[in-house]
Structures are given as C-alpha cells and as structure tokens.
C-alpha cells in the first residue's frame, strides 16, 4: 500500500484522532452485530500499546443533523468497547465545542475517548457549508488515522476534510490496510480464474458503474435480486409486479451487449419465488421465468432451479465476489436463496470468496458461515466503489507512505 501506516508514526504520549465505522445495527438499545467494532480493535489496541491517547470518531445511522437524537447516540457502543478494552471509556456528549475540548484535554495516554455521533452536526455530511467543523475535530490531535473503510467512499468532513489538516500525519489503520490489500490483490490485480461476481440488491442504477467495471475483469456475472428483474425485462421476460427500474432497461440492454462482446457470461434467474406481497412470507409459489410471472404477482427470491444454477457457477469458479442479497432475506422463506449462496460460498474452500459488506454480510452472519468466507468486507458501498475506481476519497487523501 502506498499510504502512510500507523506503524510509521511515533505515537508515545501523542493524541490520535481515529475515524472508525461504528455504524452498527441497534435495536432497543442493544447492538445486534458488533463486527465493525471488533474489526477496529487491532488498531485501537496497537495505539494504546504505543502509549497514545485515542480519540474515536464515528457516525451512526442517518440523523437529521443539527440536533441531538437519542436514537442515534453512540451510547450503546460504550459497554461493548469497554468489554473489549477492559477499562472505562468516557463518551463525550458532543464531538465539538467546549465539552468535547475538555474531554480531550483530560484524556491521558493509554486511554480511549469516544466522541458523540459526528452526524449530529451538518458540517459532517456537508463540509462546504461549515468548514469550521473539520477544523475543530482536527485541533484535538497530533495524528489522524482512518480505519473506517465502510465510510471512505463518502467525502464527509471526518473522512475527507479532516485528514487534509494533517499533512504527513494522516495514516491508514490496520482494518483499512487489510481491506485495501485484500480487495486490491485478490479482485483487481491478480484474481484467480474463473472470476465470478454476484450482484444483487434492489437497484441496478446504483450499481451500473461497478457492473461496467466488472465486465472488464470477470468471467461470469450473476445478476439477481431486484436488479435481476430489470435485466429480465431487458430480454423481454414477463416479470409481473416485480421490482423493475423502467429507466434502467436501456442500460441493462447495453450491459448485456457489452458482456457478449467481451465474452463475459451473464447468469440471470430462471425461476422465482413469487407472491402477491412479501411482508408475511405466506401464499408463495415458484414459477419459471420462461413461462413468466403474471400481473398481480412479484418475485421476492430466486427459486430452486436458480439456486442450483448459481451454485454450479460458484463451484466452478476460483474467485467469487458477492454484493447484495438475491431475495428479500429479512422475510422467510424469501431468505432461502441468499442463504444458499452464502452456504455455497462457505463450502467452496479452495476458492477465494469475498463478501462485499452490507446486506450480503448480514446474510452470511445469519447463515452462520462468516468464518468460512475468505474475506467479509466491512464496507458495502465502499467495496463496490473501490472495485469500480480502484480507490476511495477517504484513502486517496491520506499521506503518502514514507520512502
């Protein structure tokens, strides 16, 4: 990696501002999955071992900005952090202002301070409207470390503006290094072949850039989930009331033409679990795509024949990247297709298997097979943008590696 690493920093007695991604799922004040917190621990432990004072910065959810909202407070993070660290972690009630400055001033080397959600301030997501927000955050520390891969595709203040205020002192954390090196080496530089990408999720338009980029490097492209129905419409299949982006049909046709020209094999669903609606998971049946889905019914998951087809493609591949569920996995039985993909990846131990964060990572966790996947990324949108552009705003802006 050509960026400054925390290994290169002289940290003893210094204050370090660490951008982490603690955007974890929370219900009734309890964290449902703490993998993003666990993933940041190697960096935090290293900094503490070097006798640095660690100031953690994160967002959580999508608050309105400009006001405190208890539902998006980082307070539930504190007991989990304390459990991993074995000591008290104070939470500053704000990330800027006098209360935050005092909390930082009182922070001793070898200890950790968590600042409250940066998105409570509009200057985080709209740094041009309030440049002073980044300046206040940067004033706390001697060094800046970005360990928030999952947020580094956004040009937000704590990810993009703050590191610019640390010339030659803005470094990548261990999680960031791991993500960039694994994704770069195994998917961009030297993927073992055949290389298959599986893309699901609702919208095709949000992934058109990465689809076009992948066409130049993959051998097989599996398209399913909501976006799969847009592609099926592009080849004149009847999909009933299934989710279709009408404006995306011409784009889908161009993708199919380009794939054919490049010799990339496209795989689309051949059957689907359909129902009038998906909220209850009842009154469903499987229908062949060839026969068509009638009006009044919609596809909410891939069917048994498609699971068999996609599994065969996976088993014959040496590298597989998966982003986006292939069905409405939150509602059984429409979770069966996504879980089958997860289990097939997990059982293919000789392949390099990469799950690109987000909902696909959630499915792998639900299926109980995350430990059998080569790499489960902490970034959904970030992993896609990295594959599309080979870099991210939050990593580009870090200081260059020391020669």
From Swiss-Prot:
> One GO MF term, please?
phosphoglycerate kinase activity
Q: Which GO terms describe its cellular component?
A: cytosol
Q: What is its EC number?
A: 2.7.2.3
Top enzyme category: transferase
Entry keyword set: ATP-binding, Cytoplasm, Glycolysis, Kinase, Nucleotide-binding, Transferase
State how it assembles: Monomer.
Q: Tell me the protein's name.
A: Phosphoglycerate kinase
């Amino acid at each position: 990696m050509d960026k400054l690493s925390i290994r290169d920093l002289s940290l003893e007695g210094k204050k370090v501002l660490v951008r982490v991604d603690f955007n974890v799922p929370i219900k009734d004040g309890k964290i449902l999955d703490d993998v993003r917190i666990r993933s940041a621990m190697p960096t935090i432990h290293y900094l503490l071992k070097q006798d640095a004072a660690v100031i953690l910065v994160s967002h959580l959810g999508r608050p309105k900005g400009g006001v405190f909202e208890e539902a998006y407070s980082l307070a539930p993070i504190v007991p989990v952090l304390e459990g991993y660290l074995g000591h008290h972690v104070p939470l500053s009630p704000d990330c800027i202002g006098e209360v935050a400055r005092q909390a930082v001033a009182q922070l001793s080397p070898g200890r950790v301070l968590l600042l409250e959600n940066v998105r409570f301030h509009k200057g985080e997501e709209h740094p041009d409207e309030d440049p002073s927000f980044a300046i206040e955050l940067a004033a706390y520390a001697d060094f800046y470390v970005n360990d928030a891969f999952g947020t580094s595709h956004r040009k937000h203040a704590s990810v993009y503006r703050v590191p610019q205020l640390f010339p030659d002192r803005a470094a990548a954390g261990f999680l960031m290094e791991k993500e960039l090196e694994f994704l770069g080496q195994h998917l961009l530089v030297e993927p073992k072949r055949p290389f298959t990408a599986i893309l699901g999720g609702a919208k095709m338009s949000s992934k058109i850039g990465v689809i076009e980029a992948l066409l130049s490097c993959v051998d097989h492209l599996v398209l399913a989930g909501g976006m799969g129905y847009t592609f099926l419409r592009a080849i004149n299949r009847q999909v009933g009331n299934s989710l279709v982006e009408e404006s995306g049909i011409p784009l889908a046709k161009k993708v199919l033409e380009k794939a054919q020209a490049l010799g990339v094999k496209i795989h689309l669903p051949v059957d689907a679990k359909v129902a009038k609606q998906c909220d209850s998971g009842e009154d469903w049946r499987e229908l062949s795509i060839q026969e068509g889905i009638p009006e009044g019914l919609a596809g909410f998951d891939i069917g048994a024949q498609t699971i068999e087809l996609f599994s065969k493609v996976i088993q014959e591949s040496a590298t597989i990247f998966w982003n986006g569920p292939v069905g409405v996995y939150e509602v059984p039985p429409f979770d069966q297709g996504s879980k089958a993909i997860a289990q097939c990846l997990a059982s293919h131990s000789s392949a390099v298997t990469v799950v690109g964060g987000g909902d696909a990572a959630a499915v792998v966790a639900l299926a109980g097979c995350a430990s059998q996947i080569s790499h489960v990324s902490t970034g959904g949108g970030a992993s896609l943008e990295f594959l599309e552009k080979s870099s991210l705003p939050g990593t580009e802006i870090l200081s260059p590696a020391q020669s």
